[in-house]
Structure formats: C-alpha cells, structure tokens
Amino acid sequence: MLVAGNALNCLFIDSSGFQRYLGFGVTNLNGATVKSYKQEGFVIDERGKLKRFNRKKLSRKRCGSLRGRGWKYGSGFVDGIFPVLSPIAQKILSFIQKETDPDKVADVLGALPSTHASWDDLINVSVQLRLNKKWDSIILVCEWILRKSSFQPDVICFNLLIDAYGQKFQYKEAESLYVQLLESRYVPTEDTYALLIKAYCMAGLIERAEVVLVEMQNHHVSPKTIGVTVYNAYIEGLMKRKGNTEEAIDVFQRMKRDRCKPTTETYNLMINLYGKASKSYMSWKLYCEMRSHQCKPNICTYTALVNAFAREGLCEKAEEIFEQLQEDGLEPDVYVYNALMESYSRAGYPYGAAEIFSLMQHMGCEPDRASYNIMVDAYGRAGLHSDAEAVFEEMKRLGIAPTMKSHMLLLSAYSKARDVTKCEAIVKEMSENGVEPDTFVLNSMLNLYGRLGQFTKMEKILAEMENGPCTADISTYNILINIYGKAGFLERIEELFVELKEKNFRPDVVTWTSRIGAYSRKKLYVKCLEVFEEMIDSGCAPDGGTAKVLLSACSSEEQVEQVTSVLRTMHKGVTVSSLVPKLMAKSLTVN
C-alpha cells in the first residue's frame, strides 16, 4: 500500500490497481516491500504502431534506463520512440498539472521508489508537460530531481530546465543551470547549447547568444561542425521577438555558408519568418529551394506557406498550395483549413471562407475556436456584423468558450458599423463572463468614441486607464493624437505629446505622422517641417504616411518641390535633418 498522507491520496487512490498495473518494488510506511513486476513496457514507433519493449534490457544499455536517449530537443524522443505514459506516470502528470506548491510536489514525488522505471516516468511526464507548454510544472519536477531527490540528474534534466526557464524569459536561471551543469562535470550536448542560445534570443540578448557559439568552439566544436539543431534554435529564438527578422536571415545565410544543410524544420521557420514579414514571394522562393534540394515538405511547411499568402489576402495562391498539399499525399488538418479560411477573409470574401469552413466539417475535420474566430472576423471585415454575431453565438452554443480575441473581433465588427450601444453591450458582457477588457479593447472603444465625436466618453476611458488595471500604451496616445488632430484641437495634441514622454513612451512613426497631420490640415507648412525635424532628430524613420501628410501641407508648387527633394534624399544616404533647416529657411523667405 502506497500512502503518505493526503498529498499522496490525491495521486495514488487505488493501491490494488497501482500494484496490479505497475507492480514495481515500493517500500511502504511500515517498511514492507511491494512485489516487483515484469520489466515490460509499450512504445509507439515512428509509424504509430504500438510495440512492446523490455525495460530491463533497455536499462542495461549505456547510461542506464532512458538516460541519454530519452528526450531530444526539437524531436520529442530519439529514434522515433515515444514511450506511452504508464498508469503511475499518468497519475503523476494529472497531479503535477494541478499542484503548484513545491513542498506538496516534493512530498508526493519523494514517495516514488528510486528505480529506473520511476526515472523513466518522471522524464516522460516532463516531456509531456513540455508538449503541453506547462513550463512551471516542468520546473517543479526537474528542480525537485536536481535539488531534493535521490536520483542522479543527467543532461536531459538540465536541458529540460534550461528550456523551461528560457520559455519564461528567465535567462539568468537558464544561465545558472548551464554553469551548474559544467561544475557537476557533465558534458553539454548540442541540445544544451541550442536551448541556451534560444533563451538568450528570446530575452533579446543576441550578443550572449553569439558568446555561446564561441563557448562551443572552446569545447572543440568548430563553426563548420555546429549542428542544425543549434542553428534552428538560434533562428527560432530570434523569431520570438519582433524586430529580429534581419538577424534571423543572417543566421540562416551563415548556416548555409558553414555548409550545414537546412532541414525541413529550418525551412519551415524561414517560410514562417517571411510570411509574418508580408513577403510571401520569399516564402515561395524558399519552398522551391527546399524542393530542389530534395528536402521533403511536411504539413507544417504547407501550413506556413498558406499562412504567408493568407496574410496578404492572396487566396488563389493559398488554394494552389492547399491543392499541392493533397497531391503530395498529405491530409489537411485544422491549421491548414484555418489558414485557407484566413486568406479568403483577408481578401474580403467572407462567403469563400464559409465554404472552406463547411468543407472542413464535411471532410471530418472538427473546427476549433480559431476557426470560429476567423469566421467572426471574416464577416466583420465585410461589414456583415449580424452574421458575425450569429457565428459568435453558435460557438457559445457548442460549448466553446469565447476568448478575449473572440469578443474583440465581434467588437470590431460592430465598431465598423458605428453601433456604440452594441459595442458597449459587448464590453459589459465580457466583464460578466469573467473576461476583463484589456488595453486593446479600451483602445478600440476610445477610437470608436473619437470617430463619433464623443470626446467626453473618450476622456472618461482615458481617466479609467490611468487609474485602473489596464494602463494606456503608445497606441492609446496615437489614437488620441489622431482623433484630436482631425478635430483641430492642436493644444490638446501638444499636451498629449508631452504627457506620453513623461510616461516614458517612445513616439513611433504613427505618433509623429499624426502630429504632423494635425498641422498639415491647417496648412501650417513651417510647423510641419519643425515637427518633421524633431522626428528625424529623435531617430524615428518616416514612412509613406509621413510623406503624404507633408505633401498635403504644401500650398504651392515650390513647397511641393522642396518636400519632394528632402524625401528623395532618404533613399540616397543623405542626412535628412541637415537639409530640413535649409528647407525651412527657404520657406520663410518665400512667405
């Protein structure tokens, strides 16, 4: 009988069933030993077939048990072997997913016998938690193994912990574990370096990621022999943070220069990268490249490619990829269908998206929450707010709880219709359903009130944001500056501009362009140039919108020529800020 107070009762309820299914030797509270079981287990091979394996025979291989071969970053279990969770492992998993108290976890795990089978169960549970993205739970289990258990931790345990801390942006803890690994005289694996690099990239510390590559060379790993796992982790880590697109491309090019052959996963990452940057033509180019290199695309490749075209509303191209996927013998899953629906939604064809939705159901693929959200968005974009609400209600009827995004998409649909009453009702319903409106929702209401000229309500929301849990962000001020600019309240614009700087917000190109646009509407050409000079001096690069509002401020052909001349210099490497004072001087002379 395996009982250790209430904590264990919640984990091991049926002791007879426990012995019948698990049967390994366990010492109970009275010191008696439970009879051990036959060393036999089950695995699912790479073809999805259930097979038996002899745990005893496996445990006598190098390193013992599944140590050193049980888990590998990026591929689950090595050699296509995915051990099925044993009954005791399933109970451990269920308990760990609910428990957050380290002491209770230690009490329960401490009752496990110090056997290879227990070790395998713990590692299998940790890997399953990783698949479920339960980073806190992984930390609870692996920290217990490392600090408090009688088990001898191995590199797998360290790697799982480094991964979990990296995912939580706790790079210092990941770094500390790497140092501890070295001090414990373990040899870092390629996975160790890959996960540490990814942790640094996710934290925005690219320089430290480069240091890890140097560290690899110090351990006699030359640049030519750095594996694909490390490069993939580097690229993936850079992709986790906005603004690192060029750095990720550089790593991909370096990888090819070092003659490290990209894998399907590498190409999938890069196709996704270009897709998110709205460069579907580059995604397509990479797809063609991988085919020419005999690198076989998988379902994730096609999903990424359909998504790339979907973001630009290229539904015909997305459908071609969908057909190619099926010609290659792959079965579309819910993610592919969702991506194809998104392409029709972005292209402004809600009924096309609805046809894909029906096709998905007809083919036996169950729509998920994202599928319904896409349909709400598709109808909302087309101004069919009643249809959007019908999908929203159908989702609730089926027991799919609407998320913040679901409410936001419905809110956006009615906002486009300028239906204030309905929008206010949606926000109220969110609170009643336990989904508290966030800054994004309040910004949407702010924009709606502003567009309708209801400035009192707009200022009321701003006051709530200053005193409530949802604080204002740079988008809040961009909306306010744009609304007041269109209304001609120039003094209020300057007050808001000072206020956002006091709150340590950095004005972006939208902020500056909205501010210039306010003066442009009044044809205050010189003031527009002054603000433009401030913008350049602050290090903010103008875009097409900035050029448009500057040109609209011009009231003569000469002013148009002056502005055009300055804008052209942006593409010739000339310092624009040095030309603005001259332009202003000419303008004042003319006036």
UniProtKB/Swiss-Prot annotation:
PPR repeats: from-to residues: 154-188, 189-223, 227-262, 263-297, 298-332, 333-367, 368-402, 403-437, 438-472, 473-507, 508-542, 543-573
Residue runs in coiled coils: none
Assigned keywords, A-Z: Repeat
Pfam entry (one): PPR_2
Tagged with keyword Iron: no
Superkingdom of origin organism: Eukaryota
Protein family membership: Belongs to the PPR family. P subfamily.
Family annotation (NCBIfam families): PPR (TIGR00756)
PANTHER family in alphabetical order: PENTATRICOPEPTIDE REPEAT-CONTAINING PROTEIN (PTHR47942:SF63), TETRATRICOPEPTIDE REPEAT (TPR)-LIKE SUPERFAMILY PROTEIN-RELATED (PTHR47942)
Record's protein name: Pentatricopeptide repeat-containing protein At2g35130
Taxonomy of the source species: Eukaryota, Viridiplantae, Streptophyta, Embryophyta, Tracheophyta
